[in-house]
Amino acid sequence: MHVGIVAQRGNERATSLAGEIREQLRALEVTVWVDTATAEALACAGECGRDTTAFTDCDLVVSIGGDGTFLFAARGAGATPILGVNLGEVGFLNAVAPADAVEAVREEVNRYRETGAVRCREVPRVVAAGDGWASTPALNEVAIQGEQRGHGHGVAVDVRVDGSQYEATRADGVLVATPTGSTAYNLSEGGPLVQPSVDALVVTEMCGADALPPLVTGLDSEIRIRVETLDDGGEGRVVVASDGGRLTRVDPPVEMTVTAADEPARVAGPAADFFEALSKLE
């Protein structure tokens, strides 16, 4: 069995716990890979350090930190189940407490050896695609905007859902979020909260002029977004951001579709209590 470990960068507690889990797994004769930054901190870079893109070949990935660390791990893990250990304040994706981390990982290793699979649930991701390009699949949201926000930097957008026009306006941008991502960027832009069990996508305009309220639509919807011009007179590019990290830049006018990705993310271990996590947002 192969297990990958991703720890929050610059967090000594996360690095220490990563080292402890690694030693426990090695005692169980599990092959362990660690993200390159953490491997350097643990002085095992040559032996166990790997880029997170290699974690697609693992049977389980352990993310230690906050939701940002989980998103970072998910970009490289592909279909590999990810178990999140929560060192942050909220933790919508990380359900395992640090004190329970070693035992939780051990349980999944034993389950894999007994059944050939770890316990996990599928979580949708979204992807934007245009003529000859596609964004990195996003666990939280895909945001489409100009290279800068604010007066003089917005975009003119036409948004259609399953062929019907939802909105045509000027805005800083528009984002399409999953239920998981409804608590993140979407919420800060005035979008609604959506329970993780709901099969849906959320379309939220970012500071739109005379904008309609955010729209919750089906998970199987096709959202077509056309960016006609930029408010600054057409100069600059359109930025498509996946989970705020991976950026795709395209020239306007551009048309793209945003849909649920073919391959969902897989989250291992127990599910976080959605409403308990919400209470920590206050």
From Swiss-Prot:
Record field: catalytic activity: NAD(+) + ATP = ADP + NADP(+) + H(+)
UniProt-annotated catalytic positions: 67 (proton acceptor)
GO molecular function: ATP binding; metal ion binding; NAD+ kinase activity
Chief location: cytoplasm
GO biological process, one term: NADP biosynthetic process
Keywords assigned: ATP-binding, Cytoplasm, Kinase, NAD, NADP, Nucleotide-binding, Transferase
PANTHER family: BIFUNCTIONAL NADP PHOSPHATASE_NAD KINASE (PTHR20275:SF43), NAD KINASE (PTHR20275)
Role according to the record: Involved in the regulation of the intracellular balance of NAD and NADP, and is a key enzyme in the biosynthesis of NADP. Catalyzes specifically the phosphorylation on 2'-hydroxyl of the adenosine moiety of NAD to yield NADP.
Family designation: Belongs to the NAD kinase family.
Name of this chain's protein: NAD kinase
Gene for this chain: nadK
